Amino acid sequence: MRFCWISILLIICTSASALVPIDKPNLREETGIAPAYFGPNAFPVPDMLDGRVQNHLRVEVAGDGYFGYQGDITTDVLARVHVPLFTDRVNLTIWMPVMEWYEMTPERMTTCRVPDSLAGRGHGAGDVYFSTDIQILRDRKWAPDIALRAACKSASGGQYELARHYDCPGYFMDLSLGKSWYLGNEAMRRKGDEARGVELRVAGSAGFLCWQTDNGRQNDAVMYGLQMLVKSQYVSFRTTWSGYVGWENMGDRPMIIKGRLSGHTKGFEPYVEYQYGIKDYPFHMARVGLAYHIDILKKK
């Protein structure tokens, strides 16, 4: 457990100050530093845990295409890695959009308050995210899996003046619960992909998310999410409804729904994913990715 608390402290303490002036902040004044007025990688709705943490070393690379409701287009390359911290109950996750390429329409630039004098197309690196994921409880006959996650994002993403990234730190913490039922072979619970059977899983999550805005202020939000999973030996489908609710109520309440179809074979997981922004996240997203995992803890 010592590694758990050390990792949490490192995450909470690894934050930088936003490059904004501090001058008598007016808490009633809306900032507009919110998902509705920035690029899709500014502070998207975090991927939801399903009550379980990764107990394998998992490396993932994906390509994303974001198609804005106002005609703007963003493509990026996403990288993610999960590293178990000497136990199958705790892992460190690091992810980032390594590079994005974007083209904004004049309409979108007006919505985001980008000056006409700036070019609405270009490329740039994104923010880096870190999280510690902790398995608090494993499911029993009637009890669900419970996982706690503490995460922060860097202020490394640039092009604030082009409304691509916030240029400020942020963090979130959430608790997820999930329960599975098995059809065909109860042994699938222990043997994973090696067993024949179907897993049906339902999960929910709730948490707190925060990011610094301007003038020394921050926006606090409540996170939420529901998820369903159907998984067989070689294929799985997962659908998620999630979002967060900021206190300013000015473009800071993104809500999305997405579905992912994955294959499973010999440690590889190719997948395709589609995401639709329901509110305050004006983008369709299509993703194609490949993940590979290795049992470095030799638990099997």
Predicted region positions:
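Repeated loop/turn-to-beta-strand initiation elements of outer-membrane beta-barrel proteins
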Residues: D88-L92, D139-A143, L183-A187, L200-V202, ...
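Detector for outer-membrane/organellar transmembrane beta-barrel domains
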Residues: Y166-G246
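Cleavable N-terminal export/targeting peptides
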Residues: M1-A34, L297-K300
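Outer membrane beta-barrel transmembrane domains
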Residues: V114-S117, N215-Q218, V222-K300
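Transmembrane beta-barrel domains of Gram-negative outer membranes and organellar outer membranes
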Residues: L19-S154, E161, P169-G184, V235, ...
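Transmembrane beta-strands of outer-membrane beta-barrel pores
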Residues: G63-Y69, M96-Y102, I136, A150-S156, ...
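Outer-membrane beta-barrel translocator domains and adjoining extracellular loop/strand segments
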Residues: D72-V77, T105-T111, G157-H165, A187-R190, ...
